[in-house]
Amino acid sequence: MAEDITVEQIRFKESGNGIIVEPSKGLMWMKNDTYQLTKKWMSWIQTRDYIQELNRKKFAGYGNWRMPTTSEARSLYDKNHSNKDHWGQHVPVDTIFTPGFGFLCWTSEVRNKVQAVRFGYRRGVTTFDDAYRTSRGSSRLVRDILKEDDIS
């Protein structure tokens, strides 16, 4: 009698050029977050401006990078994985992403034009913070995979 074998579906795959593909959700993530790319913390406003610069330069060949939604940022939080943040603290994020990232992630969601949502990878919680505050601010940028993209 044959045993049932469960094969774990691979959620992410590395695509090269610092890109991680998540085919099941139609997303492409940057392997490094904005802190790792720039070696500095950013406010939500600075992150928005940095994304515009990356899009002008077509980072990894694409011009439609953005901050993740809160739901997308939260989706990277997975207690089945163990990675390390900038301070060397345990963070439940897949190790396909480069260790040493910021544990607070700016998202695309804002309220009252001065506050933005940050997702905290250490505890898996969201908070509102001043969009002009740089304190440990970073973001893992993402883009939607388009039909014309070659992601092989």
Outline where the language-model segments fall:
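Glycine-aromatic-enriched surface loops/turns that form tight recognition elements
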Residues: 1-66, 71-152
